[in-house]
Amino acid sequence: LMEMLGDGAPRSAHADLNRRLRFSWHHLSHAASAFYPSPFTEAAVLTLDGVGEWATASLHLGQGKKLNLIREIRFPHSLGLLYSAFTAYCGFKVNSGEYKLMGLAPYGEAKYADLIRKHLVHIADDGSFALGLDYFGFETGSRMTNSAFHRLFAGEARELRRQFAEVSE
């Protein structure tokens, strides 16, 4: 890279390229970016994501300069992937259209909440969760949802009609 950049590279870039690369765990990075700049010296730090390495949710205890992992939930059980499944089912692109679905949510009705709690998300007494994997395709295939999910919600995944897709892009 330094050969390609030649003298056009800033001196700081040359110095950075000679340093050792360090790996950081995905959820620990999220927890650190929330806890360390906060005004708290002690806090419970909860992170939720689609998936990072294998963790999809983590609970850390932040104390001073330390973050200690208390508990984590691993793939395929993921609230982020659950949300992405609904994003795809409603006709939006996964990892791109979630904010659109979130923006539309206040205009809908919670008529499927009981169905979701009964079949899709099982919440344990300790607050942990597990997905009803029989309804999803992301664990073993390339689709977020499967035919059982479609039967549960009485229809195939939606495709945005052209005129709506143009507005939503």
Name these PLM-found stretches.
Residues 1-169:
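Short acidic/glycine-rich loops and adjacent helix/strand connectors
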